[in-house]
């Protein structure tokens, strides 16, 4: 399971002109589910994302996690993160989980974030989404479990 996390001043996601999720300061989490991922890997990745210290403390040192910084998270499904880009000029998606399984694990990941106390908004799985982001930094990390 892959999370591309971006520190945001604000972020939102919409489907067909309707906003489905919106946050102020926090993290935009683009989530890719791979074959072999499990609820345990989703929970482990949620722990890692929520605990990752990429927000500035009183000395402007990256020392606070999203919850310590008072931020929220916006989780958006992104199957393209599981793409194989090693050969050719077209990505391959055979490493991605089947859509039904990926949706269950995406929902479970978001539920884990909520259960761990994070204010959590989401996109809509497998929809054609428009994502808006004001990136803070920019600060972007690729996390994988």
From Swiss-Prot:
A Gly-cisPro motif from one monomer fits into the active site of the other monomer to allow specific chiral rejection of L-amino acids. It holds the Pfam family Tyr_Deacylase. This is D-aminoacyl-tRNA deacylase. GO terms for molecular function: D-tyrosyl-tRNA(Tyr) deacylase activity; Gly-tRNA(Ala) deacylase activity; Ser(Gly)-tRNA(Ala) hydrolase activity; tRNA binding. An aminoacyl-tRNA editing enzyme that deacylates mischarged D-aminoacyl-tRNAs. Also deacylates mischarged glycyl-tRNA(Ala), protecting cells against glycine mischarging by AlaRS. Acts via tRNA-based rather than protein-based catalysis; rejects L-amino acids rather than detecting D-amino acids in the active site. By recycling D-aminoacyl-tRNA to D-amino acids and free tRNA molecules, this enzyme counteracts the toxicity associated with the formation of D-aminoacyl-tRNA entities in vivo and helps enforce protein L-homochirality. A motif (Gly-cisPro motif, important for rejection of L-amino acids) lies at residues 137-138. GO terms for cellular component: cytoplasm. One of its GO terms (biological process) is D-amino acid catabolic process. Its EC number is 3.1.1.96. The keyword Plastid does not apply. It catalyses: glycyl-tRNA(Ala) + H2O = tRNA(Ala) + glycine + H(+); a D-aminoacyl-tRNA + H2O = a tRNA + a D-alpha-amino acid + H(+). It comes from the Bacteria. It is found in: Cytoplasm. It comes from Erwinia tasmaniensis (strain DSM 17950 / CFBP 7177 / CIP 109463 / NCPPB 4357 / Et1/99). Its main location: cytoplasm. Keywords: Cytoplasm, Hydrolase, RNA-binding, tRNA-binding. Belongs to the DTD family. Homodimer.
